[in-house]
Amino acid sequence: MKKYIVIAVVLALLVPSLAMAATEFSLGGFIKLDAMWDSNSAVGKNLNALPARNNNYDNNHGRLKFTAQGSRFNFTIKGPQLWGAQVTGFLEMDFDAAENGLTSGVAAGTQGVAFAGASKSYTPRLRHAMFRFNWPTSELLFGQYWSMFCEYYVETAEDGPFQMTGTPTARLPQIRFTQKFLGDWTVAALVGDPNQVTLPTAATGPYNAAINNGQSAESPQVQGKVTYAHDWWGKAAYYGKPTPFTAQVVGGWQRNVTRQQNFALNTLGNNINGTGAVVENALSANAGFYSQNQYVNPWMVMGSLFIPVIPTSSANLAGTAHILTNWWIGQGVEAFGFGAVTSNLYKFMNNFNNLWYYEAQLLKKFGGMAEAQYYFNNQWFLNAAYGVSKAYGVSRARFLRGASVFGLNNMEWGMGDNAQTIQQVAVTLWYRPIQAIKFGLQYEYAAAHYFQYVLPAGGAAGIPPVANTANRSNFGSDHRVEFVGFFYF
């Protein structure tokens, strides 16, 4: 009996070994060094945070930074055949999780050892973890992978370039189906994890603040795309790969939940910036109660064009040029990976018993980017790009406390310190002597026009050094010079 048990255990151990024998692994990735100087120290490593206003003395002294945290590695796994499809997997990690408290989504004070320590021990993070079934014209994907909005980036030196203007950066757990037809057309759809939207900080929006307010709405994020690609007159390089004329449209939607907010009459006061107290589930002489759910619906539509201007019909890229452009419109666009949305809106809707009721509204934005690239030869090429994003549909009327609150519908209570217009310009000279080595030297300019004018802060008590309108500002800018080196493996 003991012999049969031993044989059974050995056979059980052999089953996964036999399955693994049909699997092939390949290692890929790159080692990257970034060296940069910024005139405005409020921007993140990836230029995904707004530059501070030019009258902010704390952030306009410059910053010099060297980092290798953009390095990454990945495994491509070729698995067995199943249902007539080839099964493959992809797992990728990098070290770009936390930089210095200024990276989008990373709170100040949580930067850890990497910021202040002598040994820059950045924490690894998961980028992609997915597997897929590939048939000749179809693909079914499961796992964490790129959003459909993230397929066309400008080729600049920073990671996730133009996150504030041209292309969002988002990777979400998803189920995606892709179908090719008629040779040149591709359609795809996904359902995935909904993302957080940025509600005003003075309001407790979700029922459980520790839970993503997209997940609280219990609806997935959905995306769909249509792509047309055809070699009409030749190809040009996109990240070094010969690519034909391509046109693409992507759309996305999700739902987020919050509570309709009511505010205490005796705490809001004459505050135009929206820092009054929020009253929830409280009844008193000066407080109200409103228990209705409110749903907000982030959505975005993006159109992309890749145009070979000076094409090639071979792998020789010398003398080739392209134009790439993305243009988009939406609301709550941070749910799809755009940065620099500091808050969404609360608008005064009505009043009851002289109490003030406010309703959340998502910030509406549009924007885009355009890139031109030219290859002098197969080693040297030049890249120039411009991106812009703009908030629209924002009333500048602010609700002030008064004897009566009737007739003031749609005036805003608070919208955070949002930028009305963001612009980015980058010029990058690239040198790639061999496929494994790539160097870049870049100048980039970023500028933000804010809705609000702010006086400069100074002193321990935060008193402006000269409290007059001459010192106020609604504009911030950053000049960056960056060198980058890659070793691909």
Language model feature labels by segment:
Residues 224, 475-489:
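Outer-membrane beta-barrel "beta-signal"
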Residues 22-47, 53, 57-200, 216-236, ...:
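Outer membrane beta-barrel
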Residues 62-68, 121-123, 167-169, 214-219, ...:
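Short sequence motifs at beta-strands and strand-loop junctions characteristic
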Residues 159-299:
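Aromatic- and glycine-enriched pocket-lining scaffold segments that form the walls
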Residues 8-16:
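Bacterial N-terminal signal peptides
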Residues 77-83, 134-137, 181-183, 230-232, ...:
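Outer-membrane beta-barrel strand-turn architecture
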